[in-house]
Amino acid sequence: MAEGVRRLLGKPGSVSLQPYIKLLKTIEEREEALRKLSDAELTEVATELGNAELPYDRDDLAELCALGREAARRTLGERPFDTQLIGMMALLDGHVAEMATGEGKTLTGALAAVGFALRGQRVHVLSVNDYLARRDAEWMRPLYTLLGVEVGWISQESTTEERRAAYAADITYASVSELGFDVLRDRLATDVSELVVPEPNVAIIDEADSVLVDEARVPLVLAGAAEPAESDAAMAELVRRLRPGIDYKVDDDGRNVHLTDTGINVVEKALGGVDLFSAEDTTLLSRVNLALHAHALLHRDVHYVVRDGKVRLINESRGRIALLQRWPDGLQAAVEAKEHLTPSETGEVLDSITVQSLVLRYPIRCGMTGTAMAVAEQLREFYELEVAVIAPNKPNIRIDEEDRLYATAEEKEEAVVEKVKEVHATGRPILIGTQDVAESERLAKRLRRAGLECVVLNAKNDAEEAAVIAEAGTYGRITVSTQMAGRGTDIRLGGSDMRDRDRVVKTGGLYVIGYGRYPSSRLDDQLRGRAGRQGDPGGSVFYVSVEDDLITTNLPEAKGYRVSSADGEITDPAWKEMVNHAQRIAEGQLLELHRNTWRYNQIIDVQRSVVLEQRRAVLHEDLGSRQLAVDCPETYQRLVEEVGEEEVARAARLVTLYHLDRGWADHNAFLADLREGIHLRFLGRRDPLDEFNRDAVPAFKGFLDEARARAAEMFEKLEVVDGRLDVAAAGVKRPSTTWTYMVQDQPFSTDLENIVGRVKNLMGRD
């Protein structure tokens, strides 16, 4: 009934699984026949299945499922459940399969990858990190080998040749960031032989909600001409002396900070009587604002950690160190100055691509996750993906208790410690999920003071996270973890070897405690899903306080609660619903931010595609030579006579590509500046997006003609040196080094909030 109503309303729901379920009996019959075949004969069956194109008809699909099941049994010692085969078929139909934790998503994805690969599709299995990419590729390798398909994987340490070899395989496992960086590097290639990433066919995305929603806006960046950034230690020291609440104020939602009139006077006096709002030097106000944001809004062990003398950002959706992420250069340098660190390198952005744009390159997209329905609307809106909700192989018997709500953070912490004492006394393993690093360490200290020894898994020791989380089901173990660190690793009752499984089962299984609700219900569900794996017993409960960021940020006016007991607990159902309401507000804000970023990126992606198509023609079709032969006929002919057609073609290619790349880098910088300042026009009651498009479109008009004209101008200046055309002397200068990173987009507020806040300050001055 509910599903039918959703369809009538046009809202995303689960796709019908009936076509897949109807095949299960046929699959089982085929499986019996395949069991009699030798390995070589099984490989031959796989080869024969590949003698056709997608999609699979019902007969071939049943054969493929039976083949995958038998191959997995022989090579991995695992016979896929019916639910895994249903998930496999959903992936082959281009859906996102929602499968609970522990239901075998890795094998499901591998079986689907085989199905695509046998039909001639190049498959990229995208993971959230290098560890999982390598682990899953090696784990599934025997299965792939038996079925006659090759598998490869790449990591941050992979050489160019190793990457090329991995991408040449039928199936390639890679983290989203590494794939994106390879795509960006290919966009600077000056010869076909330098290209690494083949044309995209199929993307199977693991942890699809994390990649496609949480990180969709994250730009992957390729920079060149790196040089040390300027340290602003003096400005950091100045804002360090400012008084909170007097010289500056932080907004109630904690997303913006601004100087008060008193603070403006203090800063201007400290800087020698300058006018912060002088039109002659706009950089001074920017420097002050950056230093103030770094000081007041970005907190060590919450938003970042300092490791090996460097600022390392914490990925908010995963609770892990994000080694490849950084803030935009000015803010990055401000945080480094705040921490008295040497400023890291900065450089010119040559190109960038968001995770969303990276995934949309693939004609066929599908994925797996434990929490897809909660973001079904985004998956449909941004990726044209539908969700297939697949029931667990065994019924879920986990007991999810009602939230426990407290008046203060201190009372919540005390209640959690008491609960841990009570549960730990039974030997039941406990997993506590916290919001950030500082919180995990503070709670761990409190537990230890109470005589409760615990293992802390947070962004500071992420290298061992898989091994640590694998033991969280050990009898008597207490594990404190930031958000979803260790995601992708199963927690087995009794420890990784399951030695004490029966004893842990008798205690009630893993007990999960959420130390505060997350900004997204999906993150809550992911934490809960750690318990009750594959029909195991388990339990979960969330402890929340009115002082939690989720409440104070999204419902700052919430007051008037009544404490129900001496320990500060609030049992009023209306107040518990307020927590859900605050979470819905947070989710709505994130969705609108995603939509807003997508709208701005649409025009940029269209313009980028024009440049990339031109670049492809220059690399593969000698477009540069043909254009310059027309634009500079006399010079072209003279040079051909001097050095030959091949050398002239090489020089023409390098010159043409240089001006395409140079022009795009300049245009990209223009778009970034335009995007940064566009919200000022909101104050004039004009729509910022319309204004952005109104400026971005004409700025790109004539781009290709301009690049072609500049290439012709440079081509005329080419000289022959030792039998070759010296393009460097003519001005072709490629960056000596390039580097890649991910930008932490909008860490504390939108551009509009920041700029309007500054303008309010300006308008408030006499």
UniProtKB/Swiss-Prot annotation:
Record: residues binding ATP: 84, 102-106, 490
UniProt xrefs under SUPFAM superfamilies: Helical scaffold and wing domains of SecA (SSF81886), P-loop containing nucleoside triphosphate hydrolases (SSF52540), Pre-protein crosslinking domain of SecA (SSF81767)
Keyword entries, A-Z: ATP-binding, Cell membrane, Cytoplasm, Membrane, Nucleotide-binding, Protein transport, Translocase, Translocation, Transport
Membrane topology according to the record: Peripheral membrane protein
A GO-annotated cellular component: plasma membrane
Any Gene Ontology biological process: protein targeting
MF annotations from Gene Ontology: ATP binding; protein-exporting ATPase activity
Gene3D superfamilies in alphabetical order: Helical scaffold and wing domains of SecA, P-loop containing nucleotide triphosphate hydrolases, SecA, preprotein cross-linking domain
Intracellular or extracellular location(s): Cell membrane; Cytoplasm
Cell membrane among keywords: yes
HAMAP family assigned to the protein according to its UniProt record, in alphabetical order: SecA
Assembly mode: Monomer and homodimer. Part of the essential Sec protein translocation apparatus which comprises SecA, SecYEG and auxiliary proteins SecDF. Other proteins may also be involved.
Family that this chain belongs to: Belongs to the SecA family.
Protein name as annotated: Protein translocase subunit SecA 2
